[in-house]
Structures are given as structure tokens and as C-alpha cells.
Amino acid sequence: MSLLIRFAPPSLTAEQYDNAVRRLNEEGVFPADGLDYEICFGSGDKLKVSQVWDSKEQLDAFGARLRPILAELGIDPGEPEVVEVHSIIRR
């Protein structure tokens, strides 16, 4: 069963998001195994990120690599919302 993860950090700018993605790419862990989609949206310092994952195990493995990078960059991800996906419709 796929999972939808929704991050709504207290503050996240495009520059912070781009720096985190750059670091994840440098570490060779992004895009991660099991990550179907990542969507970043919003404006100013109120960006949000939604992801669709194949499994909780893959999400947890990625989270273990992500958390130290976010801490190093001073990004507080907040507490994500995690829900099971009922259906994904693609074009």
C-alpha cells in the first residue's frame, strides 16, 4: 500500500528546499528507492512538500538519511502527516 506524506514546516523557502535536494543528490540518496512522487508547492517561506512512497520501510530508510541533512541546514520539517493512499490516477 502506498503512503502519502505531507510536510508543512513552520518555515521553508525555495532556497532551503533546493539546498536540501542538492545535498541529497550529492549523498546519492535522491531520488530515493520507493519514492514515486515529490511535489514542492507554496510561496515565500511557506513551502510545503508532499511525497508518495511505495512502503513505510522505504520512507523510514530515506528519513534516516534526510533528518541529519535538514538539521545541518537548519530546517525544521515539523511533524509530517502520513496517510495510506486509496488510489492514484495517472494520465
Where are these regions (language model features)?
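Short S/T/G/P-rich N-terminal loop/turn motif that feeds into the first structured element of a domain
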Residues: 1-50, 54-68, 76-91
